[in-house]
Each structure stands twice: as structure tokens, then as C-alpha cells.
Amino acid sequence: MNKTQALHQFWNSFEIDAYEENSVPDDAKLPYITYQNESDMLDVKCLLTANIWYKSTSWKKIIDKAEEISKKINLHGHYIKEFDNGFLYITSGEPFMQTMSDPADELVKRVLLNITIEYLCSY
């Protein structure tokens, strides 16, 4: 598994689809996660964002999903995923979570997550 696959696997471990932010299929249905991918760097911290998207009258499900992600990252103060020749190291950014509404559709809810990732080389 390479770095990109490790990050993709992390975001797809939350029981909803996840896509790199510029590759969401036209027929994708909410809820889903979009995320940035900076896989060119090694041994450098990168500040990235991910977005959780839901369509609902309530914020409960989307906030619950954000808290699930937070728990996975912060269980040990970080999350580590092994990939070929290294490790993906994820920590929470600050602020970790921001809620946003969509002015075009009041049912669309968005939570922006700030994270820090670092690809640590093992050779």
C-alpha cells in the first residue's frame, strides 16, 4: 500500500464513502467525506482539511461522525497507519471541527476538519 492508499483507507474507514476533494463522482450521494491529499512530501508536517457532508434537518448525525473521527485520531493522541516504506501519522489540527451551512440548500450540512499529517519514512 502506498501513501495515497493509506490516507484513502483511513478516510474510508468511517462507514461512508470518502473521496479526494477533486474527484467526487457526479452521481455521489450524501453523506460522504472529501479530503485533501498531499502525498508528495516525506518527513514534513502538512496541514490538511477534510469535509463531512450530510443532507439532514439536524446536525446530530454529522456531529456524531466528526466525533467518531476525532476519537479514532485521538485515541492515543494520534493515528498511525503503515504503508510501503513508512507510516502515515495523523493528529488533530486546531480548531479540529467547524460547522458550516450551505446557503444554497439549508438541508446540506458540512463539518470542516483540520488535521495534520506526516508521512514518516522508515528507510
Segment roles from a protein language model:
Residues 1-22, 26-27, 34-123:
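Charged, amphipathic alpha-helical segments and their flanking helix caps
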